[in-house]
Amino acid sequence: MVGLSIVGRGGGIWIAITLVLVFMDRSRTRGAAVVLLALTLAFAVTDLAIKPVVARARPFEGSVATRVIDRRPLTYSFPSGHAASSVAAALTLSRLWPAGRLVLWSLATLVGLSRIYVGVHYPLDVVGGAMLGLACAVVANRLLTPRPPSTYRDPHR
């Protein structure tokens, strides 16, 4: 589980999967941009906007003794940035690699669970991060996916 927690750190595994998919098929570059934007949004919203405002202490900082298996993060606990980036990446990468959905979502789920297992997040941190990641993926997709021209015609023209 520590390995999964490390794999999710910094979004590196998701960027690597994206690069491999683009290397295999150059037509996936727009989709890769969506993945990278979703990861960037997930980081910005969790670590720069929400964590400093909520300022929730990590489980190992409380009165109950919590065993920490991984290194102790210096940031606040809620929401989980690992869960946010993993869900954002799994959702956006699923569009690039539909056959890999099971692998992507399994990895995202295991990364989230690993954060609880290694003692650095509460379950609600992971759930909140996952919901945030979902929202970031939807926003990134909306911003970077071209829309067909509107067929609406103004009747007064």
Predicted regions and their residues:
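Membrane-embedded catalytic cores of phosphoryl/pyrophosphoryl-handling enzymes
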Residues: 17, 64-157
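Helix-adjacent hinge/juxtasegments
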Residues: 31-33, 38-72, 76-79
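Terminal transmembrane helix and immediately flanking juxtamembrane interfaces
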Residues: 1-47, 51, 123-157
